[in-house]
């Protein structure tokens, strides 16, 4: 049997896989891109794309989404900080966003296959890689790229498994927009838990969710907390004053909202990489004829869980390395480009969700920002993706010492 032979086989057609396929195909490589997700099935993700990513790849603005110019941050005690963003970000439905990037890859010349590829059906020989799909089709190629998410079996096979402490959990609901379409974008830090809740309005629905560490995850109480947040959000959209975490939860208004959401909201859940500093030091995400991209490589912010920027940037760095004839330089490229930033975020995670001057750091951070324009500006830059963690403490102190 004659098999099509490709230069690069890419498993996973999310942002990392599709963008890599586009860049490689435009550079002249013969690329096969495998999308194993059922058509129309969304990835469990808030869908936020930072201003930093939009500036780096302005073509993303052509995808159907919602541009966000204002954001409400809430402390664990529900103190509110309203940010008018100098650098807007965007929120996308992952179905629309992933489809847009996959179509760009196809238009660039990549061969896209709606086939699921599992790690146990991948074999390696002196001549390269052989992939077999669940349907029985086969392909061969010289180079293998895994971009199939945080649960990637291929990544486990090539780079070894991650520890539970290196993973985070996100879960939530896709729910209808408020009747008046008055949908604010909200991030609310959790009381007595590591992590935060979000409400991200998209063109036709709202993505609600909670992100926390896998070590801290307890579904029952966190799901109850999320429902409290969701019902409070809709009450707030109706003009009521709401304390998300400490208000009355047994009111008739909340019960009516919850009854409606129980029949209309769609649940989702996912694991997100949140690697420790120790793991960043030791993890290798590429070899002579293979590479990991995006979540499959562990490339996500350990504090916020944000991964789309790192998915796209890792794809770009890998494509640069491969097309230059030196794919082995990918490892050095990502470490020099964003490796130190993610390692610093890993070091900061415990402190970010720990205590500072007798209260949660997130509480103090929002308190300071409410009273100081300089600190507020730094937080706005952090949301935009323009402020990194390496010099965050220095920037906060420097701005806090300036006159208000």
Residue ranges and their predicted role:
Residues 17-18:
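N-terminal Rossmann-fold NAD(P) dinucleotide-binding loop
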Residues 8-10, 31, 290:
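Conserved hydrophobic helix-helix packing surfaces used for dimerization/oligomerization
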Residues 51-102:
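A conserved beta-strand/loop capping segment in the N-terminal third of enzymes
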Residues 2-14:
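Beta1/beta-strand and adjacent pyrophosphate-binding region of the FAD-binding site
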Residues 13, 27, 104-243, 298:
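Predominantly flavin-linked oxidoreductase catalytic cores and closely associated redox partners
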Residues 119, 216-321, 328-329:
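FAD/FMN-dependent oxidoreductases across multiple families
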């Amino acid at each position: 049997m004659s098999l099509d032979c490709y230069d690069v086989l890419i498993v996973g057609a999310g942002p990392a896989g599709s963008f890599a396929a586009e860049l490689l195909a435009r550079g002249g490589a013969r690329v096969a891109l495998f999308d194993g997700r059922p058509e129309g099935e969304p990835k469990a993700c808030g869908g936020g794309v930072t201003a930093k990513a939009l500036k780096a790849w302005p073509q993303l603005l052509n995808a159907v989404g919602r541009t966000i110019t204002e954001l409400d941050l809430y402390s664990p005690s529900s103190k509110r900080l309203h940010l008018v963003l100098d650098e807007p970000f965007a929120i996308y439905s992952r179905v629309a966003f992933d489809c847009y990037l996959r179509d760009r890859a196809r238009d660039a010349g990549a061969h896209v296959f709606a086939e699921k590829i599992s790690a146990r059906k991948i074999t390696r020989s002196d001549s390269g890689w052989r992939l077999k799909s669940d349907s029985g089709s086969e392909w061969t190629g010289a180079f293998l790229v895994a971009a199939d998410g945080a649960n990637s079996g291929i990544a486990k096979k090539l780079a070894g498994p991650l520890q539970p402490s290196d993973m985070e959990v996100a879960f939530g609901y896709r729910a209808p927009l408020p009747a008046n379409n008055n949908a604010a974008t909200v991030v609310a830090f959790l009381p007595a838990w590591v992590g935060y809740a979000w409400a991200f309005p998209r063109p036709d629905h709202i993505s609600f969710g909670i992100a926390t560490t896998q070590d801290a995850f307890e579904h029952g109480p966190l799901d109850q907390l999320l429902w409290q947040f969701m019902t409070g959000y809709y009450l707030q959209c109706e003009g009521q004053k709401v304390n998300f975490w400490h208000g009355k939860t047994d009111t008739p208004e909340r019960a009516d909202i919850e009854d409606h959401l129980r029949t209309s909201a769609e649940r989702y859940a996912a694991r997100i990489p949140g690697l420790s500093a120790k793991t960043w030091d030791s993890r290798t995400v590429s070899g002579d004829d293979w590479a990991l991209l995006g979540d499959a490589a562990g490339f996500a912010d350990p504090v916020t869980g944000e991964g789309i920027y790192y998915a796209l940037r890792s794809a770009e760095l890998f494509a640069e390395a491969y097309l230059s004839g030196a794919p082995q330089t990918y490892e050095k490229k990502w470490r020099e480009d964003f490796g130190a930033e993610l390692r610093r975020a890993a070091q900061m995670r415990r402190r970010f969700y720990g205590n500072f001057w007798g209260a949660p750091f997130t509480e103090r951070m929002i308190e300071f920002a409410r009273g100081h324009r300089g600190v507020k500006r730094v937080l706005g830059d952090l949301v935009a993706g323009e402020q990194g963690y390496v010099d965050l403490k220095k920037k906060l102190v420097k701005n806090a010492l300036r006159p208000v």
